[in-house]
Amino acid sequence: MKRITSLLAVLCLTALLAACAGKGAGQLPPPESPAAAERSEQLWQALVRQSARHDAAPYRLGLSLRFGSQGDTRRVTALFWGNDDSHLRLDVMAGVGAVIANIVEADARFLIYSPRENVAYFHEGSTKPLLKVGVPVPLALADLSALLNGRFLRAFGEGHTPVAASSPDTAAFALEKRLGGVLTLDAQGLPVRWTENGDKGWRMELLYDEQGLPRRLNLTHANGQKAIVLVKQRDTVQQPFTEEQLGLALPEDTPLLPLSRYRAPADGKVAP
């Protein structure tokens, strides 16, 4: 009987040690545990510090944008500039010097002008106007500006609740305002993935340059739409842009239509 009791004790001790070993590196504690809460808060504070590194300032970015679905994609280039996130210009080009769209966003007002068709569309509100013109980027220009320039809290908001992460080196948060969804941070506190709420929403992955600024956004949607936004060039801007440089003067005979009147061309290509 003593031998059986001793054997059972050894087996129980072995099982206990194995269980403890299984909780070592490589496994995440439950989100509600003190260790998980501490790790999440540390990475969120790292995000706060990352965002604080980049004040709003005049900028100009050269972008490349590829978008579409499997077997049907387009590539355009763009110049994106502004003094901060409140008054922005985006010129979209299909070739060298061939501007196909001039876009202005200021104080939640959005204006897009097609020089080829001499027609302009306007929109006012907090929705995502780029989606309405067939460009699969689920962000307002102000959010895109903040994101590409490293002002992550401006883009994603400050309200957050820790949720289970997919790896020990990351932390995930349900966002309460702004874009909503779930944001994943890496070990440096940089956003590496954002997933929209719902099973039919957007997913965005972020890659960075040596300065810790986004250089590539990979966007996918459950319906098959995809977009890749590449930052090809960051220009140093010494002086703030003037109102004329940020504004958009339309020809006098330009029809001005609500963005709800926008219709994609019959050939299925995004326009303007």
Identify the function of each model-found stretch.
Residues 157-265, 269:
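Gly/Pro-enriched, hydrophobic low-complexity segments
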Residues 72-76, 101-105, 200, 226-227:
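Amphipathic hydrophobic-ligand
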Residues 57-65, 76-78, 86-92, 101, ...:
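One face of beta-strands
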Residues 20-75, 250-255, 260-272:
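N-terminal leader/targeting segments and the immediate start of mature chains
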Residues 1-20:
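Sec-dependent bacterial lipoprotein signal peptides
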Residues 128-158, 173-179:
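Extracytoplasmic segments of membrane-associated envelope/inner-membrane machinery
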Residues 64-70, 95-98, 113, 178-181, ...:
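Hydrophobic lipid-interacting interfaces of membrane-associated proteins
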Residues 86-142, 225:
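An acidic-aromatic
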